A protein has these predicted regions:
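Polysaccharide-binding and catalytic clefts of secreted carbohydrate-active enzymes
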Residues: 102-270, 274-291
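Conserved, mostly hydrophobic/aromatic
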Residues: 12, 31, 39, 68, ...
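The substrate-binding groove and active-site-proximal loops of carbohydrate-active enzymes
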Residues: 9-19, 44-59, 106-125, 147-154, ...
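Aromatic-lined substrate-binding rim segments of carbohydrate-active enzymes
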Residues: 26-32, 40-102, 235-242, 460
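N-terminal carbohydrate-binding accessory modules
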Residues: 1-40, 51, 66-67, 74, ...
Length: 669
């Protein structure tokens, strides 16, 4: 298995420019005790490197790079372009972004640039080039980190002009634009490209999450994602103009709504991301997001940031309990990471992140619980050498995640404000997670033939080519699982006429006549063929069978007796249509049928409360075994007699794992 790295990178964000040089040396001593081998530097240093328009000063950065190189660190080199220097804002105020309310921001904050500002792009490109020119040939520079956590939104004049250019390229004519956006509605016909304005609070926005014209707002999302991506590519290409084989990434943010990460991943050498769950985030949700980040390129990823213990920006910033950070890190490795990196290595003394966790706390020593846990994990990862690097996850289930659908579903007005895209995806992922069935998170244009089951929850927008791809998959023996609010609109958010689920109707063998929305306090029930019942709610499709077989039927309301779930034979395969949001037991009853029908297997034969994930190299299968429950769990019999790479001991019959306990077992192929 190929990988860019020679060892598991272990370290994180380091800002020695915030400290005196005597502390630098103390840091090197302490970091060595934690087995830290990498530092991400220069993330927010533009103001120091370029103190005025025509002046650069690399003296301090030279010292930092020399120090880390002498200590044999792998350097992740950031380009510093995520926060603008004051001189630029003072001289060129148009570089600052304009928010959804139409307010142009002043100097301050971060992620504060307009991506369509020619001034910003000129100086960002120049800075990336100069950094590469100076440091790219240093053998310790392992990876380039462009900007940081791309994520603002801008609605300024620069963006308005660029949006019009983007639209001209896409639609060619005003007539085509008017048809795509259905501009006869509310008399919104545009006569000239200059009539088009960004859909913010001053035009067709209805709050930041809703819109009068989803077609416009979805296109603006697409345009803005492309605009930010163009900035990333610009800096990447500036680096590669100096060093063509430079390894370049930027840190993504999981299920962040603003950017189409599948499109971004095609331009990145490796996906990296920042994992900051809250105290009550389900472990299945964390696992799903790791699998999504792995799925962006279908390759191992970098964990660019996590906190050693505490965050600072959530509502309740709980400490990670003893053993929790270690278990969380192994879960990250299990789902495809080749690096474990923290924000931050030394805790800041000021600013809004001064209470964000760090390897070195404000006490300034290694005599802390957090440091001891970091050091323990570092020693373990170091002992693995390169054995796990580049190993791959295997899956027979593909779960579709699509940013166009994310935007379209949540922009639409109705039928329920509680309908959230990521929640729906997670509901299905969680079933497979609890069964220890491997899942790939996949785009809509994936090769479906790799999977026995493809799950497409709330596939609201069926874009060109998707119908044919899904039909071919099912006809050739695959199982498709889809749900309510699927097959409703095309790629411009205009409804498919002829009845829901539109292009999926023949394959599903059902016609949805109406969609009922239930308030949180309202529930229905569905009855299965074996007489059991399950609660359901949120949305209830009123559907008619057109060749499909009912799996469950509603028990209550005027549509009692109508199907609540169905399956339809189509070619050699089957389409399952789930017409309502079942509670967990009911959903499991349906998905169990699909899994049994096609013979999808769990990682191990036993049912267990442990999370068990495998990665496979050319010569070894690695079993990551983790206990995230509150109870002791007995190790399944199929995992006994294997060597634990952490303890170097063989697993035994009846072995118990307490909460946060971890095993990494190896099986030679």
């Amino acid at each position: 298995m190929s990988t860019h790295f020679k060892r598991i990178l272990y370290g994180g964000d380091y800002n020695p420019n915030q400290w005196t040089k005597d502390i630098w040396q103390e840091d090197m001593r302490i970091f060595k005790d934690a087995h830290i081998n990498t530092a991400t530097i220069n993330v927010f240093s533009w103001a120091k490197i370029q103190p005025s328009e025509h002046e650069y000063n690399f003296d301090e950065l030279d010292e930092i790079v020399d120090m880390l190189s002498k200590e044999n660190y792998d350097i992740v080199f950031a380009t510093s372009t995520a926060a603008l220097p004051g001189w630029m804002v003072r001289k060129y105020p148009e570089v600052m972004f304009t928010d959804y309310e139409g307010r142009q921001h002043k100097f301050g904050g971060r992620h504060n640039a307009c991506p369509n500002s020619f001034v910003f792009k000129h100086y960002a490109r120049e800075l990336a080039y100069k950094l590469a020119e100076r440091y790219a040939d240093n053998p310790h520079v392992t990876c380039w980190h462009v900007s940081n956590e791309y994520g603002n939104e801008c609605f300024c004049e620069n963006c308005q002009k660029a949006f019009r250019v983007w639209l001209k390229d896409k639609y060619k004519t005003i007539d085509a634009l008017n048809r795509a956006w259905n501009m006869e509605f509310w008399g919104h016909t545009v006569y000239d490209w200059d009539d088009v304005v960004p859909p913010n609070a001053l035009s067709d926005g209805i709050g930041s999450e809703k819109t009068a014209f989803a077609g416009i707002s979805i296109d603006y999302r697409r345009f803005y994602s492309d605009s930010q991506l163009a900035c990333f590519k610009m800096e990447r290409d500036a680096i590669r103009s100096v060093k063509p084989d430079a390894f370049v990434t930027t840190n993504l943010m999981g299920t962040f709504k603003g950017l189409d990460y599948f499109k971004w991943a095609k331009e990145m050498d490796v996906v990296s991301w920042d994992n900051y769950p809250s105290y009550d985030t389900p472990w299945s949700s964390i696992a799903m997001t790791h699998d999504l980040m792995r799925g962006l390129k279908d390759e191992p990823f970098m964990l660019m940031e996590q906190t050693p213990s505490q965050q600072n920006w959530q509502k309740y910033n709980s400490l990670k309990r003893p053993g929790q950070m270690r278990a969380q890190s192994y879960q990250t490795l299990a789902h495809g990471a080749d690096t474990i990196q923290f924000f931050q290595l030394r805790r800041s003394v000021g600013g809004c992140e001064k209470f964000h966790g760090a390897v070195i706390a404000h006490a300034g020593s290694e005599n802390t619980r957090v440091f001891r846990e970091v050091a323990q994990l570092g020693a373990e990862l170091e002992s693995f050498g390169d054995r796990t690097l580049g190993s791959r996850n295997e899956a027979e289930v593909g779960l579709i995640f699509d940013w166009d659908n994310y935007w379209a579903l949540e922009y639409t007005s109705g039928p329920s404000e509680d309908l959230k895209y990521v929640d729906q995806i997670h509901q299905y992922y969680q079933y497979f997670y609890k069964k220890n069935i491997g899942v790939d998170m996949i785009p809509v244009d994936a090769d479906f033939s790799k999977y026995k089951i493809v799950v497409a929850p709330v596939l609201y927008m069926v874009k060109d080519g998707m119908k044919e791809a899904l039909e071919n998959f099912v006809k050739n023996g695959g199982i498709l699982i889809t749900t309510f609010m699927s097959g409703i609109v095309g790629q411009s958010d205009n409804v498919y006429l002829g009845g829901y689920p539109g292009p999926l109707r023949e394959m599903a063998g059902v016609w949805v006549e109406e969609i009922d929305a239930l308030a949180p306090e309202q529930k229905n029930k569905a009855k299965f063929a074996d007489g059991s019942t399950a609660a359901c709610g949120l949305l209830c499709d009123l559907m008619h069978l057109e060749g499909a077989k009912a799996l469950a039927s509603y028990e209550e309301d005027f549509y009692a007796g109508m199907p609540a779930a169905s399956k339809n034979t189509y070619g050699k395969g089957t389409t399952y249509y789930i017409a309502t949001q079942f509670e967990e037991e009911g959903l499991a009853k349906i998905l169990d049928q699909a899994v049994q029908e096609v013979g999808v297997s769990s990682v191990i034969p036993e049912e267990t409360g442990l999370e068990v994930v495998t990665r496979v190299s050319d010569i070894t299968r690695f079993y990551f075994v983790m206990n995230f429950t509150d109870e002791e769990q007995i190790l399944p019999e199929s995992l006994t007699g294997k060597k634990d790479m952490i303890s170097q001991k063989m697993t035994e019959h009846g072995m118990k794992l307490k909460k946060w306990d971890v095993l990494l077992l190896e099986e030679h192929l």
